[in-house]
Amino acid sequence: MALRIGTGIGSDTNAYFAGKNAAVKALSSLGVDVPELGIAFSHYEYPILQINDGIKATLGEKNLVIINSQGNIISNTFKKRSVVLSLLSGHSYYHAVSLVKNLSENPYVAGHHLAWGLLDSLEAKTEKKEIQKKLVLVFGSDSFIQKTELLRGLQEVLGVRFPIAGGIVSSDSSLNPAELSFNRQSSKDGAVGILFAGDNLVIGIGSGHGWIPLGLPKKIKKAERNRIQDLDDMSPLKYYMQYLGKHIDLRNEDITSIATIYPLGLEVEKDSYIVRFPKFFEPGGSIIVDSQVVENQHARLMMGTRKALLEASEKTISKALEPLQKENITPKFVILIAGIERKEILGIDINTEINIIKRKVPETTKVIGIYTRGQFAPLEGHSQLTSPSYYQNGAIFIAAVGIKNA
């Protein structure tokens, strides 16, 4: 039986019924097939175990992953307070799921445990037969600063260039952890991974962000954990004031909008930048971001515009579809993971971004997505299936999933 997917959405006020209604619609969408895996993106305001119970009241005891979100996508629609459930079935692919808790104690070790949990689970399903592993999706609670350490632990086991993507989930602000669960085991200090494998499974991925360099690059001279203290010969505050003007007191104002439009870009390869949104400026001029920063890395002011973000989205979906188009394969589904900060810039154009993606795929292709405050994704504009992933802010990641034609 080929890979099939059914999707459904629930947006009831009551969490139990939101989950239940999403499950009823997803089962109807799936048809006669029996689901083997459920993946639910559930807004952080819903109690996750109530969502679990509502879904399982309809599905029974199937493998179910639930991830808190800032907002969800189904088809061509952005919906904030909702549950979007995807049900997968078929024997033409394999999946493995693993959950780790106490993530903040040692994210690097947690990454190792998560990766080995996925590999052990897959080995048990395939009876140790060698199967091509294609993609890992990983979601972690925003309970820790060392986001890159979680990724490093995963990469040391799975391979630095193995496709790893996902997000960090928080509630109303970054470093305010939201919840995730696997089969009613839930955590606000954990990570869940989903491994997709199969010799006939074809997955294309793309990623980008759309913020463009504005200011001159400066070297990070002094940094401690997630605090940037010195950029060459000046504080981060002075660097910002140099471009935005001295009339804005960034230490006393709510800088959310300013930080979203004008984030910092960290250079990880020549002329390739990942985005970091400032959380706030300290009285001494230091800047706080949501993940650890290394010294001697170049940083520069970036700028986001609607046009540039939408162009990045179009490039991202085109890149994701390339491997499938080369083999004349219709994607069964497309999954999108994106920074909720994109909505701050795009506003009502957030649906334009979604429609750019929807228009690129056939009507039969399901489109689902989750908005988070941090993303794991390859660099913009690189060979996506062989490029290492990085922890980023504001990114858009897309995976297109299909099955080889018989």
Give the location of each predicted region:
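Small-residue-enriched flexible segments
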Residues: 1-58, 62-347, 351-360, 365, ...
